[in-house]
Structures are given as structure tokens and as C-alpha cells.
Amino acid sequence: MKYQQLENLECGWKWQYLINKWKDGETITKYIDSSEADHAVSELRKLEHEPTKVLEWIDLHMAEELDKKLKQAIRAKRKRHFNAEQIHTKKKSIDLDYRVWEKLSTRANELGCTLSDAIEYLLSEASRSEKASAAVSTLKEDLSKLLSD
């Protein structure tokens, strides 16, 4: 699915991504010499409030091996950004124990669906089973009343 690209917003994301990588101690520039790398990073840090100039910095200074990772990160961020706008596409997160996730994953694979679809299916099956059980209990009570009279 294609999402609209918003240059200013995405340049800000790219700047943030690069700064976070730099703070984590990763090499973000293509330079081997540390003084050149430090100079390039200081230039990048000055661009915080000029997001569109980040693209120019990326073309001039960014390490080649970071290009693919940056594009993937921005694509994922764009998807999350646009999905968060609508309640039905907004993602929620839940914590599962590993064994619970494993059982759910196995069941989802058996059903040939996603984890979310499997949860939805299992909940509807449980509800249906509960209703059937209540109906059987009511029938048993009615039958026992008829037989005791």
C-alpha cells in the first residue's frame, strides 16, 4: 500500500534517525577520518530546524550502508503515521508470554491467517460455545422440570 510522502515531516524523521544512530555510537558518515566525520555530524546537528536541508546532507555525507536501513525505517514510520490516523488501522500492542504467543502462532498458521485474525476467530468461537452451553443448560433445566412434574 502506498502512503503519501510528506517531505518536511519525513526529513525530520530522517534527521532524528541519523542523530539517534550517532548517539548510539554507530558510524553515520562515509568518512574514515574522524575529524571529517565529526565535522559532518556537527553540520547535521545544526540542521535540526531546517529539515529539508537534511536531504542534501544525506547525499553528501551519509554512509552508503545506512541508506537501505534509513529507507526501511522511514517507510515503516510513514506506514505507522498514516495508520494511526484512523481508529480501525491504528495498531495496539499487547504483551504475551512466549508460550502463549507460540500457541497462538501455531493456531494462526493452522487457520492460515494473521495473529489478529486468529484472536478474533478464537474469541468468536468461545462466545458461540458459551451461548450454546447456556442454551443446553436451559434445556436441561426445562426437561428436568417437565420430568419431575
UniProtKB/Swiss-Prot annotation:
One of its GO terms (biological process) is regulation of DNA-templated transcription. It comes from the Bacteria. GO terms for cellular component: cytoplasm. One of its GO terms (molecular function) is sequence-specific DNA binding. Keywords: Cell cycle, Cell division, Cytoplasm, DNA-binding. The keyword Cytoplasm applies. It is found in: Cytoplasm. Gene3D superfamilies: MatP, N-terminal domain (1.20.1270.380), Met repressor-like (1.10.1220.10). Required for spatial organization of the terminus region of the chromosome (Ter macrodomain) during the cell cycle. Prevents early segregation of duplicated Ter macrodomains during cell division. Binds specifically to matS, which is a 13 bp signature motif repeated within the Ter macrodomain. Belongs to the MatP family. Homodimer. NCBIfam families: PRK05097.1 (NF003471). HAMAP family: MatP. This is Macrodomain Ter protein. It comes from Vibrio vulnificus (strain YJ016). The gene is matP.
